[in-house]
Amino acid sequence: MAAEKKTEVLEKKISIKPRYKMTRGIQVETLMKCADNSGAKILRCIGVKRYRGRLNRLPAAAPGDICVVSVKKGKPELRKKVHYAILIRQKKIWRRTDGSHIMFEDNAAVLINNKGELRGAQIAGPVPREVADMWPKISSQASSIN
C-alpha cells in the first residue's frame, strides 16, 4: 500500500548551468511574490533544493535557485500543496562578477512543475542577467532582463 503511493518530486535531474556566486537573500519561511500568471499570488519558501549547509543552519537561496514553496494566497487548487519555484528577484544586494552591485524592490519567484517547466505563460517584472543565463525558458518569457 505504501509502495503504491508516490509523492511528486522532480522527475529528472534538471540541467542548469553552474550557478554564479551570489549572496543568498532568501531563507526558509520568507514570503515572496509569484511573478507569473499561474494563479498564485504569495509564496512561502519551505526549503531549497541542492543546498548544502551546516548543521542547524536555515537553508538559503539566491536568484536562480530552486525553492520548495507553498502557496499562501492564490487559487484554491494551488493552496495547501507543496510546489517548486525558481527564485528570480531578491531585495538583498549582491555583487556581480564585473564589480557592480544589483538589488530589486521585491522578492519574487516563478512556479515550475515537477519536470522543470514553467507553469505560467508570462513573467511580470525584471529578471537578472544571471537567472536568464541559467534558465533560457525564463529569459524568453521575461519582459525585461537587467
UniProtKB/Swiss-Prot annotation:
Keywords: Ribonucleoprotein, Ribosomal protein. SUPFAM superfamilies: Ribosomal protein L14. GO terms for cellular component: cytosolic large ribosomal subunit. CDD domains: Ribosomal_uL14. Disulfide bonds: none annotated. InterPro entries: Ribosomal_uL14, Ribosomal_uL14_CS, Ribosomal_uL14_sf. The keyword Amino-acid biosynthesis does not apply. One of its GO terms (molecular function) is large ribosomal subunit rRNA binding. It comes from the Eukaryota. One of its GO terms (biological process) is translation. It holds the Pfam family Ribosomal_L14. PANTHER family: 50S/60S RIBOSOMAL PROTEIN L14/L23, LARGE RIBOSOMAL SUBUNIT PROTEIN UL14. Belongs to the universal ribosomal protein uL14 family. HAMAP family: Ribosomal_uL14. This is Large ribosomal subunit protein uL14. The gene is RPL23.
